[in-house]
């Protein structure tokens, strides 16, 4: 699964922005990348919606400022206006497999769904 067309490139660029500590610390910047109907199943098993993710990142302060190492980023355009990305992350010794769906909207590409699954130890 790998496609590097313009839609996938844009989704990858935006995904990496969401993982940037400076972006994560800003509710406005995070909110600009999340679809109004965004939801996530986190590595903790918790279900998050757009409002709860923005609030959690804003309240995390320095905890959210640590570096997130990304590897194995791959993507494919499933249909016009819909991109699926898969990749792995490591942060503070925690590793997770990740999957994201990006949707093209009138305001640009927005993250619609995300799931993180911890690595088996």
Where are the language model's segments positioned?
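A beta-strand edge to alpha-helix "cap/lid" segment located at domain peripheries
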Residues: 1-32, 37-121
